[in-house]
Each structure stands twice: as structure tokens, then as C-alpha cells.
Amino acid sequence: MILDLMRQVGGLAQGATAEVAVTTHHDRELAEKWCARTGNTLVRADVDEAGAGALVVRRGHLPDPTEILGADRLPGVRLWLYTNFHCNLSCDYCCVSSSPQAARRELGAQRIGRIVGEAARWGVRELFLTGGEPFLLPDIGAIISACAETLPTTVLTNGMVFTGRARRALESLPREGLALQISLDSATPELHNSHRGSGTWEKAVAGILLALSLGFRVRVAATVADPGPGELAAFHAFLDDVGIVRDDQLVRPIALEGVASEGLALRRESLVPEVTVTADGVYWHPVAAIDERALVSRTIEPLTPALDAVSRLFAEQWARAAEAVALFPCA
């Protein structure tokens, strides 16, 4: 067994893998010990009940995901909550098909409170509330305030409904431990309005300026398929002038999800998970929160089993990945 390992793994380039045949559980134990002693990695064991089959062994250690992704992007650090799915807009690339006609599918304040408490105890360190448009909910102020009291919270919004009850809810929110992420796709109205509707750019900019004037930390996120020459530079320059720091300026691609007719095709295996809870279940990532292929569990409470499952599945995915997993930054 040891000779087979030396012969098949010893000549590999760093990071390459080889299959090594085994006939018993004892062979696997020997391989595990050899890998531990030699600095190699047993990636996977495809064996039957008797221990016969093949081991996949990697030359060298797996890269530490913390070093590659950063500690703040490891699975389980972030938790996304879809507060609702109905929206005042019908964006033509919405990854979860939100619109004024969409079913509301609200999580509800009490359930959100229970989920957030459990998540904090599990080890989640940051919350993201999204929709739909969260500020359409009559109790959104109480929901956001309770979340921000427990963990640092970011609320994704189109920034267009800050009038009346929603304006009062906005003004009541804490400034510490809370950020508002407002959608704006371009430095001028044409591109933004072509996807989100006539007049939406002006209203989104007004929402950004209002939130800044009220003392909130504001992030701005653009969703852009194929930016033309100079478009991104103009976008960043516009936000610089508005007063949004560069770390709070995000540009992300369109995903081929929801109502989008084009965009980046994603697979669960190619995404670093960011656990996402909706009224329908727990999903692998917020960009795929209505995609059955990304469903982790229909059981929302307790949340711990789903968090554990995602962590375990990602560890397995990381160990056997032949291609790098990719971040899809929603925030």
C-alpha cells in the first residue's frame, strides 16, 4: 500500500490528484497515516462495505479556505434572510422573480427573531435582509432594529419607497451596526432605467442622498451584464462625488436566475455558500433563493441542522474541487 502511494502520488505536481486502489479498511487507515506523515491529503474514499475501492489522494495540503476567501466569507459567517418577495419594481434580471404581483412569502418578525437568535448562538457573525423590497413591510422597522441589536446587519433596498410609513421606519432605525445597500446600476439614468423602469434612477439617487443625510452607512450595488468603455469608471466617480467610499461600491454580474434571460450560469458546486433563509426553505446562496438545485432544506427551524449541513458540504466540496469555487458578491 505504501509503495503504491509513493509511486502514484510522489511524482505528481503539487495540487494534482491520483486514484489509489485499496482492498481493505486497513489499507485506507495506512493511507490516512501516510498522508498525515508526508504532508499529502486524502481527498475522498470511494469504497464498499468491505473497504475495497479507490482513494483519491492529493499531492500536498489543500489550501486553507480562510487564506483564499478571507475569514469573513467562510460558510456560516453570513446569514441572508428574504424578509419578503413582493416588490414595487419588476427588474428584468431579478434573480428571485420579485415584482408587485409576486406572492409576498414573508418570513415574519417573530420567526426572524427566533432564526437570528439561533444563528448568533451557532456562530453567524453578520446578517443581510433582502427581498423583494423589505421597506414595503409595515413592521420592517422593528425587524431591522431587532436584527441590528443582535448582529451587524445590512438591509438591501431599492431606496425608492422612503415616504410615509417607510420614511418613519427608516428614521427610527439605529445608525450603529446597520448599513443600507441601495441598488443603482449606472452613473446616468439610461442603463439603470432600461432594466428597472422609467424614472427609477432618479428615485434611487434620491434614496441614497436621503439615507446619507440621515447618517446611515450606505453601500451602493450595481448589477451590470457587460459594462461599456468607461461606464465603471464613471459609476465609481459618480459615487465618489456622492460620498460613498470605495469599499462600499459594489459591481456584480447578472446571474442567469429568476426572470433573467441572460447572465452568468451558476451551479451550487461553483459557489461559496452564503446560507439563505426564505419562507420556502434554506438555500445555498441568495442569488439562487428560488432555485430548487440550491435548496438545502425545507426545514427552517431549527436552523442549526441546515447550517451544519452547509458547512459539511462545503468542506467536502473544497476537498474534492477540481476547479476553484467562486464568490458571487451580493453585498
Give residue ranges: language-model regions.
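Accessory C-terminal segments flanking Radical SAM cores
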Residues: 254-331
